[in-house]
Swiss-Prot record:
It comes from Neisseria meningitidis serogroup A / serotype 4A (strain DSM 15465 / Z2491). Residues 1-403 are annotated as: Carboxyphosphate synthetic domain. NCBIfam families: CPSaseII_lrg, PRK05294.1, PRK12815.1. One of its GO terms (cellular component) is cytoplasm. The gene is carB. Pathway: Amino-acid biosynthesis; L-arginine biosynthesis; carbamoyl phosphate from bicarbonate: step 1/1; Pyrimidine metabolism; UMP biosynthesis via de novo pathway; (S)-dihydroorotate from bicarbonate: step 1/3. Residues 133-328, 673-864 form the ATP-grasp domain. ATP 1 binds at residues 129, 169, 175-176, 208, 210, 215, 241-243, 285, 299. Mg(2+) 3 binds at residues 823, 835. Mn(2+) 2 binds at residues 299, 301. This is Carbamoyl phosphate synthase large chain. Mg(2+) 4 binds at residues 835, 837. Belongs to the CarB family. Mn(2+) 3 binds at residues 823, 835. Its EC number is 6.3.4.16, 6.3.5.5.
């Protein structure tokens, strides 16, 4: 059956901001779906609140709305655009829940819109824990013993039936939000309370624990004629009890017999049929008891998921693209497989002749108070994938791709008690402690007994440890061609071999080159080399035949950003994708190097050639040797490729764009100071210190408060504001080992200054400003965590012109070719330069969406020698509307972590709001970030002494909107003196009823809480912020944020929806 002709336009719902449990894999699937449906002639309408996505580029859909993903907003878009159908399976849990809300609130019926890809009933049956269990029993598959509960009494009764440890799973959530494993009654009550809050239907599944069972996933695609194929099987290295998003996973499954695999395959197809997923991709999770082989179904997702992005990258089969086409009526046998150039139909099950390993990336260093033990609630922020011909090779490649300083199984501890603890209670580095256990003399049986990891995986690591021991007992010259090749085939990096031999990495590399030992590159082709493939999707391995077949065209190689993490996220991937697209359009052959399976950059048709490899010097140099590119771009992948810049230049690689020396001039304090002095620009007073005594002496010279940080950081890692010599001493003792042979930087902190971000692009001759963004939060909050407005909402034209002049002067002085980002602080009308980054910044996608100028593309062409004039980019575009970017935080996943913002970045994602006024844009950005302001209730204010004057306007704005105002004693007294009617409310230590009670009783609509720097007032008010977080009450830890929300709330009853195409069209007509 060919495609449906009764549908003309289709609305795709995106996944919104990047949060833990839902990352950029949905940008990848949504972008594929847009392309697939437009290819077939459908009009595609897209809604997604995240500006840092490729799918929200104006070219991806016919009409694009960067608006909050909530049913009320989507209804306005439906009323305006009148789509025939909605495809809700491309945007993760957010899109599914939004689609169900549209159905429940009668919107789909009112406008006669059909759900395609998954019916309301199928979504409900898969996501509703009780219905799912009934469905499984009906087809003879068992689930863990479990009970669906809607009240705490029901939950307690269910727990008695299933016993401890007990698993708690909320309905309709993703990333295991709100769930957990309870080992006693107190834990059980706490997790249930959290779970009821997290579930939109106030429903929990109380389930028997299958801790220690083996976990598997099947990625399945089905069409309307009931053709079903398995894309790939995935096995978890970690047994049940760790969320699959936090587990190391391996594809294809390694420890199933063929018979077991066939049983699981048949079961997964039966699950899809019973749930009613008629078309598209789904993933089904199983647990197998290692004692007797008993198999149970854990859950299924009736949509493309994190696992399907992994399966797509692991096999080369574009699940999201195929699922989108199946949703409009195609069948699998009618679709061709792109990767084989159409030689095979999409109904061929992929077959793979290599092993894929995925390892999650965590960011616990950003949340020291968080519990870093892994359970059923997901905590990782990114992931890395590697391919090899053996499990050992792909595992070790994945470890070095993580960029946590590993180059293999680096030792972590030799203390047997600590090793035992780490094996028994999984944390982010359990696999390293397995290796340590073998080093410390544990037997395979003992290790298996403690951690329940399958003995087959343990045997692989044991073998690697024997190899390590043999290497460290010898010297480099012992490693002849055969010996070194054996190590390389098992995935050992030059750097790890160097550590074992106590020599430099360079010596091992030179020795290997003398032996003429190099990797070859194999192709990912979905068919285990049965058919020839034109698609250059490659991974390295140490074998005989190389399948790279490089061309002799003029090539540019783009180094990607590696795994997502806080401080380096999807924004950098966005820039890499744009570089590849722009340079392809300009006639270059583009080569992408990256190892992040969630991203658009690792899609095989984004660039001409894709190398799925770790971003280490060894791996990059080998690709350069094979491809011999004309130029390499290191400026677009964040800190990851920048760290390689100098070493690449030393090895004769041509880095195009801003030179490595200029990057160093901007990053190196002393050199940068000289640049600013020569230009006559101001910096906050600053000093450099190499040790504690020097720091204390220099701090006295400048005066407190100070911002202290190590040099060369991204995301404000280990950056703090200190107010006294005691705090500085503590910082120097606890945080200073952050960067090797790098001193600590001390800057005078500009209190209550306005921070400003500027992105610009230069071709070496001309400089064009991309956008000037005024931060909402004052200087001292990391720029990645601050809301910002383009154009500025309160900076005078004179100040903006001065900022433009200074930006251009620095771009010329540093010899920038490509993109540059500058952060300024404005205090009492004086402009200070805080820092300059001559590279792509995280605001580039936002600026591009707000102005219609694709900065990353323009910058990439500049690097390749195409001038701004030739590109027709000669003047700054200032929008005639407001665009506001807001950060999204993962605090709800880390109970106990304080929500106070500071100079260390902690947000995982961002949203954008657009409006005719700053207030409207800011309010929509807050909605996009998940903040919901109740239309009634009280506004609670509790601010430090210096903020009291600033909070008067906020109180007046909210009072005018009909809210009551309540405040703690000092703030209430101050506001009353200034003519406001305020109810005084107790702080928690002052006795009951206190603010914690008012929050729990649902009396408070919004919290503004700022604290002075002394630890006592921070800990006294911690409970206010925690209660607000748990009750989902919007809270602001800066007066600026509270004031902006009070302005925004004025326009909440008349919010418009604006498409990117109509906004950009307006700007083009104006110019």
């Amino acid at each position: 059956m060919p495609k449906r002709t009764d549908l003309k336009s289709i609305l795709i719902i995106g996944a919104g901001p990047i949060v833990i449990g839902q990352a950029c894999e949905f940008d990848y699937s949504g972008a594929q779906a847009c392309k697939a449906l437009r290819e077939e002639g459908y009009k595609v309408i897209l809604v997604n609140s995240n500006p840092a996505t490729i799918m929200t580029d104006p070219e991806m859909a016919d009409v694009t709305y960067i608006e909050p993903i909530m049913w009320q907003t989507v209804e306005k878009i439906i009323a305006k655009e009148r789509p025939d159908a909605i495809l809700p399976t491309m945007g993760g849990q957010t899109a599914l829940n939004c689609a169900l809300d549209l159905a429940r609130n009668g919107v789909l019926a009112k406008y006669n819109v059909e759900l395609i890809g998954a019916t309301e009933d199928a979504i409900d049956k898969a996501e509703d824990r009780g219905r799912f269990k009934e469905a499984m029993e009906k087809i003879g598959l068992s689930c863990p013993k479990s009970f669906v509960c809607h009240t705490m009494n029901e939950a307690l009764a269910a727990q008695e039936q299933v016993g401890f440890p007990t698993l708690i799973r909320p309905s309709f959530t993703m990333g295991g939000s709100g769930g957990g494993i309870a080992y006693n009654k107190d834990e059980f009550l706490a997790i249930c309370e959290r779970g009821f809050d997290a579930s939109p239907t106030h429903e929990l599944l109380i389930e028997q624990s299958v801790l220690g069972w083996k976990e598997y996933e099947m990625e399945v695609v089905r069409d309307k004629n009931d053709n079903c194929i398995i894309i790939c099987s995935i096995e978890n290295f970690d047994p049940m009890g760790v969320h699959t998003g936090d587990s190391i996973t391996v594809a294809p499954a390694q420890t199933l017999t063929d018979k077991e695999y066939q049983i699981m395959r048949n079961a997964s197809l039966a699950v899809l049929r019973e749930i009613g997923v008629d078309t598209g991709g789904s993933n089904v999770q199983f647990a197998v008891n290692p004692e007797n082989g008993e198999m149970i179904v854990i859950e299924m997702n009736p949509r493309v998921s994190r696992s399907s992005a992994l399966a797509s990258k692991a096999t080369g089969f574009p699940i999201a693209k195929v699922a989108a086409k199946l949703a409009v009526g195609f069948t699998l046998d009618e679709l061709r497989n792109d990767i084989t150039g159409g030689r095979t139909p999409a109904s061929f099950e992929p077959s793979i002749d290599y092993v894929v390993t995925k390892i999650p990336r965590f960011a616990f260093e950003k949340f020291p108070a968080a519990d870093d033990r892994l359970t059923t609630q997901m905590k990782s922020v990114g992931e890395v994938m590697a391919m090899g011909r053996t499990i050992q090779e792909s595992f070790q490649k994945a470890l070095r791709g993580l960029e946590t300083g590993l180059c293999g199984f680096n030792p972590r501890s030799s203390d047997k008690a600590e090793i035992r603890r780490e094996l028994a209670n999984p944390g982010p580095e359990r696999m390293l402690f397995v290796a340590d256990a073998f080093r410390a003399g544990f037997t395979l049986e003992e290790i298996h007994e403690i951690c329940a990891i399958d003995p087959w995986f343990l045997a692989q690591i044991e073998d690697l440890m024997k190899e390590e021991k043999a290497v460290s007992d010898g010297v480099l010259s012992d490693l002849d061609y055969a010996a070194l090749r054996r190590l390389k085939r098992k995935g050992f990096s030059d750097k790890r071999i160097a550590q074992l031999l106590d020599v430099k990495e360079k010596e091992v590399r030179e020795h290997r080159y003398v032996l003429n030992l190099h990797p070859v590159y194999k192709r990912v082709d979905t068919c285990a080399a049965e058919f020839a493939t034109e698609t250059a999707y490659l991974y390295s391995t140490y074998e005989e035949e190389c399948e790279a077949r490089p061309s002799d065209r003029k090539k540019v190689m783009i180094l990607g950003g590696g795994p997502n993490r806080i401080g380096q996220g999807i924004e950098f991937d966005y820039c890499c994708v744009h570089a590849a697209l722009a340079l392809r359009e300009s006639g270059f052959e583009t080569i992408m190097v990256n190892c992040n399976p969630e991203t658009v950059s690792t899609d095989f048709d984004t660039s001409d050639r894709l190398y799925f490899e770790p971003l280490t010097l060894e791996d990059v140099l080998e690709i350069v040797r094979t491809e011999n590119p004309w130029g390499v771009i290191v400026h677009y992948g964040g800190q990851t490729p920048l760290k390689l810049a100098n070493a690449l230049v030393e090895n004769g690689v041509n880095i195009i764009g801003t030179s490595a020396d200029s990057i160093d001039a901007a990053e190196d304090r002393e050199r940068f100071q000289k640049v600013l002095n020569d230009l006559g620009l101001r910096q906050p007073p600053n000093r450099i210190a190499h040790n504690e005594e020097e720091a204390l002496v220099k701090a006295e010279e400048i005066g407190y408060p100070l911002v202290v940080r190590p040099s060369y950081v991204l995301g404000g890692r280990a950056m703090q504001i200190v107010h006294s010599a005691e705090q500085l001493q503590k910082y120097m003792r606890e945080a200073v080992q952050v960067s090797e042979d790098s001193p600590v930087l001390l800057d005078f902190f500009l209190n209550n200054a306005i921070e400003v971000d500027v992105d610009c692009v230069s071709d070496g001759k001309d400089v064009v400003i991309g956008g000037i963004m005024q931060h909402v939060e004052q200087a001292g909050i990391h720029s990645g965590d601050s809301g910002c407005s383009l154009p500025p909402y309160s900076l005078s034209e004179e100040i903006q012109d001065e900022i433009r002049r200074q930006t251009k002067a620095m771009a010329y002085a540093l010899g920038v070719v490509g993109l540059m980002n500058v952060q300024f602080a404005v205090q009492d009308g004086v402009v200070f330069v805080l820092e300059v980054n001559p590279r792509a910044s995280r605001t580039v996608p936002f600026v591009s969406k707000a102005t219609g100028v694709p900065l990353a593309k323009v910058g990439a062409r500049c690097m390749a020698g195409i001038s701004l004039k030739e590109q027709g980019v000669e003047k700054e575009v200032v929008p005639d509307f407001y665009a506001v970017k807001e950060a999204v935080f993962p605090f709800i996943k880390f109970p106990g972590v304080d929500t106070i913002l500071g100079p260390e970045m902690r947000s995982t994602g961002e949203v954008m709001g657009v409006g005719a006024s700053f207030g409207e844009a800011y309010y929509k950005a807050q909605l996009g970030a998940g903040e919901r302001l109740n239309p009634t209730g009280k506004i609670f204010l509790s601010v430090r002494e210096e903020d009291k004057e600033r909070v008067i306007k906020t109180a007046k704005n909210f009072q005018a909107l009909g809210y009551g105002i309540c405040a703690t004693r000092g703030t209430a007294q101050y506001l009353t003196e200034h003519g406001l009617i305020v109810q005084t409310i107790n702080k928690v230590p002052e006795g009951r009823p206190h603010i914690g009670d008012a929050l729990k009783n649902g009396e408070i609509a919004l919290v503004v809480n700022t604290v002075s720097s002394d630890p006592q007032s921070v800990s006294d008010s911690h409970i206010i912020r925690q209660s607000a977080l748990q009750q989902r009450v919007p809270q602001y830890t800066t007066t600026a944020g509270g004031e902006a929300m009070s302005e925004g709330a004025k326009s909440r009853d008349h919010l418009g929806v604006y498409s990117v195409q109509e906004l950009h069209g307006r700007l083009k007509n104006r110019s």
